[in-house]
Amino acid sequence: MKKLLFYLMGGVLAQTQTFAQQVPLATNNTAAGTIAGVTAPVVPTATVPPAEQKITVYGFLRNDIYYNSRRNLDLRDGVLDVYPSDATNLPIRTGTVLTANPNDDANATPQLGYSAIVTRLGVRMGGITAFGAKISGTLETDFFGISNGTAGSGSGTENLLRLRHAFVAMDWTKSQLMIGQYWNPNFIVKCFPGTANFNTGIPFNPFSFVPQVRYSSKVGKDVSLMGMIFGYDLAAFSPAGTFAVGSGVDAQKFATLPAFASQLTFENKTFLASVGFEGNTLSPRITDTKNTSTGVFGGTGTGNIQKNISSNLFTLNFLAYAKLTTSKITAKFHSTYGQSYTQYVGLGGFAEYRDNTTGEWKYEAQNQLNMWGELISTNSKKIQPAIFIGYLQNMGLGNSIATSSIKTGTLAFQGRGVSMATGRTFDNMLRISPRVDFYSGKMKFALEYELSMMKWADIQGLIPTADGALPTNIDFKPGTADNARPFTATNSRVSAVMVYNF
């Protein structure tokens, strides 16, 4: 521990410091011959120099000032905004009749914020070999914390350290094995949004750090293949919802199956492109009650016993991205389609309900399309204008649910952006973010305007038809009828950011 502290302190003082890792001296012994029958002493003729372990301290000091014209779902006192909040004064529905709501919209309230919690500190290690591979490692943290506090309470973990990266990489000539915590498979280090806002393209761009085992291999001159298994160890970066087993972390652990992903990538000096997929298994519930006479689940009282159950939900999503780099521009495009994005600070989730006949729990995942693009002018090294555009669409459940198959009072939605309590769901979201980055040495200033428009509506399947009856199916798509109470929540955000890299 003392030695580690010495390394870290030396790195902070000198920024980059090299330490000698002591190893036993190896000798090549050669007999000098014999003189008068006496053997000459063995003389060492060569030594192997000690390996050098390099430790580099890096990071940046960052300060953000931001203004929002509307309240949002946000993180850490608004430093990271996700999407504009729905209206609180929607028209009042009575049967099939809508009447005006006289109240003000409580979410139509501006805010001005300041923060330095994105400041980052990291340590890179390397310079040694093992198992025939070059070994390197990274330990990275910031002051973003891991949870939000109640507004005005100071009860969150803002300003506290959180673990971002902690991994070891083993590099051979044509392959790499990485073990530890790093970016999720859909966050592409060589192709991610460079927004001034710390949201880094959330909720269009998947964002999270996950413990993983990742193996990459060159399969051609410009082609590589990556495969990995991973899991969750932080509720904020796990499937969102109110799980019977705890958090989304627990839901994956009880499934006893790791998430997995694979990508095929082409890359040369100017062009990068890849396609991939990811699978994830959850076990939202592990116990239930069962009637010993009827075999029906979910009962209470005499004749019902507790049973362990296996009710897994499997989700699948797909990825495609590309990046073009020239002397004048950098263009990026990234798209995902699938069913599992709340663990990436995204929207959507899954519906759960009890079968009306057997009482067993059933699950249906919601489908979603996410895409974003970014264009950066690189004509100048000092001033670089850019624009980010993101779009997402709620595609509804993979299979609609017949309302007759749902046991009364058991239908729920686990996720983000959809609520059975309010009967509301997101429809689509568009974000347009122009910015200008100013560079000078290790300093950067950025000014950005972010326009986010989220369309909300009542959930299709919960809206009465003209005769007052409810539809026979529910798919959690947004309603399209006039009485679906559509509302587009719009937020204008202006950000000013200062960064000093070291």
What is the role of each PLM region?
Residues 68-72, 148-150, 188-192, 234-239, ...:
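Outer-membrane beta-barrel proteins
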Residues 106-109, 151-154, 195-201, 239-250, ...:
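Extracellular loop and loop/strand-boundary signature of outer-membrane beta-barrel proteins
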Residues 54, 115-120, 162-165, 208-212, ...:
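Transmembrane beta-barrel architecture of outer-membrane proteins
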Residues 486-502:
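Outer-membrane beta-barrel "beta-signal"
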Residues 78-94, 353-358, 409, 466-474, ...:
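Surface-exposed loop/turn segments flanking beta-strands in extracellular/periplasmic regions
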Residues 6-7, 11-76:
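N-terminal periplasmic/intermembrane-space "pro-region" immediately following the signal or transit peptide
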Residues 267-426, 430:
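Detector for outer-membrane/organellar transmembrane beta-barrel domains
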Residues 48-79, 83, 87-99, 104-235, ...:
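Outer membrane beta-barrel
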